[in-house]
Amino acid sequence: MLNLENIGPSEIYLPSYLFDKTHRYLDLLKKKYNKYEDISLYLVRDNVEMDDEKIDIVVIIRFYRNWVQTLVPIVPVDEISSEKKVEFYELILSLNNELADTSFELDKDLGLIMISNETHIDSYVFDVFEEEYNAILNALSEFFKRAKKIIPNITEIARKGMQKWLNKHSSYIGGFDSESLYKLDQTP
């Protein structure tokens, strides 16, 4: 007999339920994606606009004990010249302060600047998912507009950042090369 009194709230976690919910949410938003249920991960093909240009991105959705994280790897730190680093870091710190629901962060292992947000499973409903997902896209759009003034080839550098993250995790996700980076399988 299961004694629920001994189970704390942090131990009640249903990964398949969250994974299935995310599948439905992505279908409702008509997104193209690959799903990796064995490692609780979605890769979503999307794009953001900068001026008249559409920039292809890969949005990563992953699950931790009580959290759903949405993130996009964007800039390898080693791609930013030493002359531009201070101005670039000032930009992302300013954006961290200005933009709600998103945070720029550093993956030290990969030397990658990423943007992310987290949603607690207690509030993981479609409206919140859509709002958090769109917050990432809006923040990226604003980031690219401002970063282009500092680093003119920011979109090329961002593509390298996404590829770097995917390469690190390719053994789990089946590998991606530059040509197939944005050709994800699943369409609703």
Regions found by a protein language model. Name each.
Residues M1-D56:
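Charge-rich, low-complexity N-terminal segments
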Residues K32, V58-I60, S103-E105:
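Short, surface-exposed charged micro-motifs
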Residues L41, R45-S82:
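Hydrophobic-cavity lipid-handling domains and compact docking modules
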Residues L71-L112:
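Short, internal acidic amphipathic alpha-helical interface segments
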Residues I74-I80, T119-V128:
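A generic structural motif
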Residues I113-N117:
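Short, aliphatic-rich beta-strand segments
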Residues S123-K160:
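A contiguous, mid-protein "functional segment" used to position or interact
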Residues K148-P188:
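Short, highly charged C-terminal tails/helix-capping segments
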